[in-house]
């Protein structure tokens, strides 16, 4: 499987992409995250893209960004993305999602991303 997903003890929902990932796999990950969200929960979501290869076309990235931003369960989510590169392969998705109201903060360190989600720094 191209991704793993779990709710950690600190209540962070963590998605790790391990491989080459296409549009359908990204949508499946979002759908699974939304199923974990409890009504009224302020979601803390950690998306680890440090070992992922993007197989989506530009059109699919734009479509996924819109899909991501349209999920009611993620409307007020606090989202951290971890990438291994200075230039994220996820930049189109994030830009389109941001334009549609979804916000994410990028990190190069898993530890920093977790600390931010837990409110240890702004």
Give, region by region, the residue ranges found by the protein language model:
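Amphipathic, Lys/Arg-enriched alpha-helical "gate/interface" segment within cytosolic domains
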Residues: 2-122
């Amino acid at each position: 499987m191209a991704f793993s997903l779990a709710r950690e003890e600190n209540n962070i929902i963590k998605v790790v992409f391990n491989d080459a990932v296409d549009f359908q796999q990204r949508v499946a990950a979002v759908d699974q995250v939304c199923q974990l969200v409890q009504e009224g929960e302020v979601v803390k979501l950690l998306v680890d893209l440090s070992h992922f290869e993007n197989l989506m076309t530009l059109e699919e990235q734009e479509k996924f960004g819109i899909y991501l931003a349209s999920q009611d369960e993620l409307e007020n989510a606090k989202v951290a993305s971890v990438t291994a590169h200075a230039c994220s392969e996820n930049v189109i998705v994030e830009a389109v999602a941001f334009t549609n109201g979804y916000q994410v903060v990028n990190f190069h360190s898993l530890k920093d991303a977790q600390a931010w989600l837990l409110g240890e720094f702004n």
